[in-house]
A protein has these predicted regions:
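Short C-terminal tail/terminal secondary-structure segment
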Residues: 122, 240-265
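Canonical Rossmann dinucleotide-binding motif of NAD(H)/NADP(H)-dependent dehydrogenases/reductases
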Residues: 1-30
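C-terminal helical subdomain
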Residues: 90, 150, 154-155, 159-162, ...
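Hydrophobic structural elements of the Rossmann-like NAD(P)H-binding subdomain
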Residues: 68, 108-110, 181-184, 194, ...
Length: 265
């Protein structure tokens, strides 16, 4: 069965691999990125998100079966907030009426293993309150504070995104419309975004201390793409609200085997 997918971030990395695999299987893919995509748009702005959604609906002729949101930044600056969180949530909201008309609508999002890392609760709260202006001000404050505070920005965007997915997944707009909405939480993936982080043996050693991956080490984008494709396929009928960590064991290595007691603490 041929399906129509809208995928953000298709110029490189996980989204590029996902797009290629889906196209090879005969599906239609509408790719979005700042350049080198079917739709060139800046998801860091409200106008860019709305324009991208409008063009996606036009190119799909009003028929969208799944959205896979992979576009993201890892820079320790406020723009990362706009792209990683609002560039997902507002974009999805704009596509929801069209997506809901599919017989098997699905949403899959790229979060990160960083959602489990230290974050700024204040920044996370501002994003979850859909207050972009406040969130940007908080992020700028972290940059201005220095001493590494700006490094909390990326993890905060992914924590907020995974929490938004849990919050929204069971609401009538999503569950009531038959739309599973989930995320993947990758560990270290061999993409242009992280190339500089694993460029030397010393860098590899340092990052594995922070993000241990005892099962098979760093992964290729195709490994994550396969999970995104299943989550956004008709085969996924009941999995929703989840961030599934595809991380070579990082989550377990860092949090241990008993996360249930931690959840109740």
């Amino acid at each position: 069965m041929t399906r129509t997918y809208v995928i953000t971030g298709t110029a490189s990395g996980i989204a590029a691999a996902t797009s290629r695999i889906l196209k090879e299987a005969g599906n239609k893919v509408i790719g979005i990125d700042v350049k080198n995509a079917d739709i060139e748009a800046d998801l860091s702005t409200k106008n860019g998100r709305q324009e991208a959604a409008k063009k996606a609906i036009e190119l799909s002729h009003g028929s969208i079966d799944a959205v896979i949101a992979c576009a993201g930044l890892a820079h320790p600056d406020p723009q990362t907030v706009s792209v990683n969180y609002f560039g997902v949530t507002e974009f999805l909201s704009a596509l929801l009426p069209t997506l809901s008309q599919s017989p098997s609508p699905r949403v899959a999002i790229t979060s990160s293993m960083a959602s489990l890392m230290p974050n700024s609760p204040e920044l996370v709260a501002a994003m979850l309150a859909d207050d972009e202006e406040k969130a940007l001000a908080i992020a700028q404050g972290l940059v201005s504070a220095g001493a590494g505070a700006e490094q909390l920005i990326y993890g905060s965007t992914k924590r907020a995104l995974s929490r938004w997915i849990r919050r929204e997944s069971i609401k009538p707009a999503w569950a009531g419309a038959g739309i599973p909405i989930n995320a993947v939480g990758p560990g270290i993936v061999k993409t242009p975004m992280v190339a500089g982080m694993i460029a030397t043996p010393e860098a590899v050693r340092d990052i594995l201390q922070m993000v241990p991956m005892p099962l098979n080490g760093f992964m290729e984008p195709e490994a994550v793409a396969s999970l995104l494709i299943w989550l956004s396929s008709p085969d996924n009928t009941h999995t929703t609200g989840q961030t599934i960590y595809i991380d070579g064991g990082s989550d377990v290595a860092l949090r241990g085997e008993n996360i249930w007691d931690l959840a109740l603490a």
